[in-house]
Amino acid sequence: MEEEKVKEGLWELAYNLWWTWNPPAKELFRSIDPLLWKETKENPIELLRKTKLLENKLKDEDFISHFKYVYSLYKTYMNRHSKYEDTYKKPIVFLSPEYGLHHTLLIYAGGLGFLAGDILKESSDLGFPLIGVGFMYPQGYVKQRIRVDGWQEDLDAQNQKELMPVKKVLDKEGKWLKCYVYVRDEKVYFGVWEVNVGKTKLYLLDTNVEENTPWNREISSRLYVPDKDLRLRQQIVLGFGTVILLEKLGIDAGGFHINEDYPSFVFLAEIFKLLKKGLTWDKAIEEVRKISLFTTHTPLRVAVNTYPFHMIEEQFLFVKDVYGIDVKKVLELGTNPEDPSEGFNSTIMSLRLAKYVNAVSKRHQEVSSKMWSFLFKEKENPIDYVTNGVHFPTWICSDLRRLYEEYLGENFVELHDHKSLWELIRDIPDEELWEYHIRNKERLIEHIKDRARERWVKEKADPSILMAEGLFLDSDVLTVGFARRMTGYKRPDLIFTDVERLKKIVNDSERPVQIIFAGKAHPADIEGKKIIQRIFNFAKDPEFGGRIAFVEDYDELLAHYMVRGVDVWLNNPLPPLEACGTSGMKASMNGVLHLSILDGWWIEGYNGKNGWAFGDYEVEGDRNRADAEAIYNILENEVIPLYYERDERGVPVKWISMMKEAIKSITPNFCSRRMLKDYINKFYSKILKEEG
């Protein structure tokens, strides 16, 4: 094969995120320049731009052979046909304010984004016609820096598009495709970027274009801005911009699925489109409702987006002149009938304009149905549920894949949502599964120490910071992981309720424990920042003996290391505020045991043999103390003894039995394949039938 064709093929692979969940492709890029691969944090685009070793590799027969193998896998995947493509001729358009696809594409903040990313990946794997739309955030989300006093500083993270897997969408003249929407009476332009997620397309809107005024260029600048006016403009551009973009691209949407209320104005944009065609207001709403799905993630009414009525009125004054509709009709869509004073509520608008609504776990359905019941007094509450799932090929460790290929069969990835497949996990020898797990723990600790070393070299950081960030971690020690957004209701510091008792647990000379924390607080979340500071200062405290670590700037790369490398995944939000949670699913699929309060998905996932649970009790008085006490008791009486109980080979046989049960029970039930099939069967098939 000609060298230029190999280069073209490598660039094609680098610009399609298919490589991120296919280990042979990862290994292909790593083999080009292993040191640079590590330095670039596994970014193939940056690797190909910077490496000086590629020319030699192109003369290496083994490398060329490896490339041909990977490229053939890729082409076979991209060209395969699915039953869904035959059944559904129009796509579902999926809108989300964030997407967690890979750490080289920093347009995510947390779990909501990774759920969206996993839906795109799974739609590609299943061959289901789905298109994603979101924002290209030039500044992404905050970069976290922890000061010596433990306080989180929020640094701007400038996205370097030339190093990201994004390309400009071009118009018929070969120029960057730009569209515009009206925000109030002003044109706001946006350029369009494209991301290839396997066979699925993701389009990203970017208002940072020269046609815009400085204040309008800021609309898509970063995720989750606190300023209400800017946030509303984001919502308007995402909703109305999506409809305009689809028209420009000639895409006839079969239906719309919004991930939280942020993109809710897409429903209104569709209504206006039908008004132009001559439909009445009520008939337009009726037609849009038929093809609309709203997924709610919020278990608290105070956490939804609300705006003063005058802001909405200013945006939609034109409806009187253009459509003969009183602007009050628009305002009524988002008005709480029990408390109009709260302003325009975009979640309420979403609930009114979507025929199909789902919560993200069975427990969350119960909470949401009760929370919004006042909207459905005269009719049946429409809130169904689809419990979240995670993309198995993305989150599973490559070592574990090799074990599965040997003992479950080469096509285990295609069959991973089949429960019967996982009965075969009993055939994996305990010592082999344990060897895999220990390797991953060693890699996690090495990665954490590399991050600390990098900060030492680049910043000459205070040694106490490096100690707190994990320099003393030990792969022989029982390791607990806690990694997620740092905010009050998730109670990250709950385990420090009884500091002296925790010191005894972690410093036990024969059976020590270490705890690794990671996660960012929202820039405006002062309580979350105080929690981080508290944990970080405990990590610096010599009395904890280096057994507590807080790793700064949690990202998707660190998440991969953590959900594979710790022994226990701790989860202790204040119930019922965990809508679902997904990090514990990722951990369980990798044989990491889940220790969690009974909330969110764990109510459905826990079977008494695949982890530990607490919180199924009524508490009078201090809930935090009761839950902390439960965690200490489980650690002291169950987790620690089980982990350190070894046979003559040094293998914790009973622990591994629980690992196998976790993998067997969680993988088929909480994978994104099961989730997407649920969406198809419950909602998408009905929406596309309505449209058809």
Curated annotation (Swiss-Prot):
Extent of the signal sequence: none
Top-rank EC class of the record's enzyme: transferase
Pfam annotation, one family: Phosphorylase
Catalysed reactions, semicolon-separated: [(1->4)-alpha-D-glucosyl](n) + phosphate = [(1->4)-alpha-D-glucosyl](n-1) + alpha-D-glucose 1-phosphate
Gene Ontology molecular function: any one: pyridoxal phosphate binding
Keywords recorded for this protein, A-Z: Allosteric enzyme, Carbohydrate metabolism, Glycogen metabolism, Glycosyltransferase, Pyridoxal phosphate, Transferase
EC numbers on record: 2.4.1.1
Cofactor: pyridoxal 5'-phosphate
GO biological process: glycogen metabolic process
PANTHER family, alphabetized: GLYCOGEN PHOSPHORYLASE
Physiological role: Phosphorylase is an important allosteric enzyme in carbohydrate metabolism. Enzymes from different sources differ in their regulatory mechanisms and in their natural substrates. However, all known phosphorylases share catalytic and structural properties.
Family note: Belongs to the glycogen phosphorylase family.
Protein name: Glycogen phosphorylase
Species of the source: Aquifex aeolicus (strain VF5)
Gene name for this UniProt entry: glgP
